[in-house]
Amino acid sequence: MAASQTFSLLAFTFSLLAFASTVSSHNITQILADSPDYSSFNSYLSQTKLADEINSRTTITVLVLNNGAMSALAGKHPLSVIKSALSLLVLLDYYDPQKLHKISKGTTLSTTLYQTTGNAPGNLGFVNITDLKGGKVGFGSAASGSKLDSSYTKSVKQIPYNISILEIDAPIIAPGVLTAPAPSASLSNITGLLEKAGCKTFANLLVSSGVLKTYESAVEKGLTVFAPSDEAFKAEGVPDLTKLTQAEVVSLLEYHALAEYKPKGSLKTNKNNISTLATNGAGKFDLTTSTSGDEVILHTGVAPSRLADTVLDATPVVIFTVDNVLLPAELFGKSKSPSPAPAPEPVTAPTPSPADAPSPTAASPPAPPTDESPESAPSDSPTGSANSKSANAAVGVSTPSLFTALVTIAAIAVSVSLCS
């Protein structure tokens, strides 16, 4: 009887494990790689780094444009404007074909990635989705007076409740997005933006040291700036900059910038060491990143610093404020780890008396190492109408933390069975 119960429990446990392992991450670039019709759209997702933002999120819908529709959009506008337009095609909700054709009351507004940029006044960051006659679905800006100028054409790929990719026949145009001038990243504009963002000390140091010109020389190919606030320079533990040599000040300021465009989404998905403008050799003056929820933490080897706000995001330039001065280990030494406690003196334990029966508990095996804790998907997920040929490459399957608990249950069940 006990053996039968144990077998049933084990079967149930491993069924749960099989279900849990179906939870997937996604890679939009790889999903679209096998669809030549979207090669232009896919390329612009990479150029604008929107691909990283999409990959860092779940419960998301991407409205893709074929090469013809994408060419009409991209041929007339700078990259920063294209990024804004494409951000309107990324919905922060999951819409598969079934849900799309069964919208409550026939119409709804959906939040887009553009809404999260802080550049969308009013409801410009929302999209109107409306079910039309004949089974058609229309899309348009949520701005007052906007028309449904875009229509759903077909499904491309679904990873249920994680990401849905749908094709539409035209871009969704929000008033003012395509006509907005591209933000400037000139010398005067950078310092002005920094001062307005509460980073006057940092801006003054860039000018007085001449490092601002180094920043300017990197603008064309890509520049990411981490600007400490004025309060950050007053914080306890920040060294007296007047005691640094000119070369050390230059290295410190160059350490606060990257010679590449790396917006927040790219920093969130980063797994490698990041070179800075101060990097002069392998492993020198670099940074690493980690995430906590939606926050990005920069690590220098001395002390962490949190990404606070986005001052400017104008491809290929992005400027962030950070809440601590970035202190490179090459100048200020690595943070000291606490000394290990002395080992306790060995104690001779008394001889235990024999037990009447073996213990019904067993130690659970350690959880397998993992970089992230993926979320589980609902069990009633619908099936997508089209699948990518490279599903294994585009979908990263990882085991959730539930694994440990389930294996523990199985181990206890086996132990109980043996004791019975």
UniProtKB/Swiss-Prot annotation:
Gene3D superfamilies on file: FAS1 domain
Region feature Disordered, mapped onto this chain: 335-394
Organs and tissues of expression: Expressed mainly in flowers and to a lesser extent in leaves and roots.
Biased composition (Pro residues): 339-371
Propeptide: 393-420
Lipid modification (GPI-anchor amidated asparagine), residues: N392
SUPFAM superfamilies, A to Z: FAS1 domain
Domain of life: Eukaryota
InterPro entries with a match to the protein in the record: FAS1_dom_sf, FAS1_domain, Plant_FLA
Induction: Down-regulated by abscisic acid (ABA).
Any one cellular-component term (Gene Ontology): cytosol
Domain FAS1: 26-172, 186-326
Places the protein is found: Cell membrane
Keywords: Cell membrane, Glycoprotein, GPI-anchor, Lipoprotein, Membrane, Proteoglycan, Repeat, Signal
Topology term for the membrane: Lipid-anchor; GPI-anchor
Main location: membrane
Pfam families according to UniProt: Fasciclin (PF02469)
Role, per record: May be a cell surface adhesion protein.
Family per similarity comment: Belongs to the fasciclin-like AGP family.
Protein name (database record): Fasciclin-like arabinogalactan protein 8
